[in-house]
C-alpha cells in the first residue's frame, strides 16, 4: 500500500488513512509519502515508528518509483492519478481541495475509486472500499485493465481531436 497525499496535506489525510488502515485486518507493508510542506511529520513518525509495517518518507524525489512498486494507491485526486493510470495501479482517491474537485479524470470509468470530498468521507466508507479492493483480486484486475486501456501517451492528440469535434458540432448548429 502507498499513501500519497500531495502538497502540505492540511487535513492530515495521510495520518487518517494510515490510522484507519491499521485499524483493519490488513497486515502488510504500508508506505506513506508526505510532501515538504507537511507540518505534522514529527507527530506522524513518533506515532507510528514502532510499527514495523509502516515506512514514512518526506519530500521524496522519486515518487514514481514508489507508485511503480505499489499494489494499491491511496491518494488525493491530483496529477498522480495519471501516473497510477499509466501503470495500472488500483487507486482510491479523495478530493482534498477545490482544485482537485475540478479533476474529472479520477472516476470509475477510468478504473479509479473516487470517494469524493475528504471533508465528508466517513471512515467506515473508506474501510469498506479499502477492504473490498484488498480482498477482491478480480476488482483490482478490472481497475488495472481499465487504466491500461487509456491512451495517455497521445494525450495532446486525444484532447485536440475532442476539441475539433466539439467545434465542428458547434459550427454545424
Q: What annotation goes with each model-predicted range?
A:
Residues 1-173:
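Nucleotide-activated sugar donor-binding and catalytic core shared by glycosyltransferases
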Amino acid at each position: 500500500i502507498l499513501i500519497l497525499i500531495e502538497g502540505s496535506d492540511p487535513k492530515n489525510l495521510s495520518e487518517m488513512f494510515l490510522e484507519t488502515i491499521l485499524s483493519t485486518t490488513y497486515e502488510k507493508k504500508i508506505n506513506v509519502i508526505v510532501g515538504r510542506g507537511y507540518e505534522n511529520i514529527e507527530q506522524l513518525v513518533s506515532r507510528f515508528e514502532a510499527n514495523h509495517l509502516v515506512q514514512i518518507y518526506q519530500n521524496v524525489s522519486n515518487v514514481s518509483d514508489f507508485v511503480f512498486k505499489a499494489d494499491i494507491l491511496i491518494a488525493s485526486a491530483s496529477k498522480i492519478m495519471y501516473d497510477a493510470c499509466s501503470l495500472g495501479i488500483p487507486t482510491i482517491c479523495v478530493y482534498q481541495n477545490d482544485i482537485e474537485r475540478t479533476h474529472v479524470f479520477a472516476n470509475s470509468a477510468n478504473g479509479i475509486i473516487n470517494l469524493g470530498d475528504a471533508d465528508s468521507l466517513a471512515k467506515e466508507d473508506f474501510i469498506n472500499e479499502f477492504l473490498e479492493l484488498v480482498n477482491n483480486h478480480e476488482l483490482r484486475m478490472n481497475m488495472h485493465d481499465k487504466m491500461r486501456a487509456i491512451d495517455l501517451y497521445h494525450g495532446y492528440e486525444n484532447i485536440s481531436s475532442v476539441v475539433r469535434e466539439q467545434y465542428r458540432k458547434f459550427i454545424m448548429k
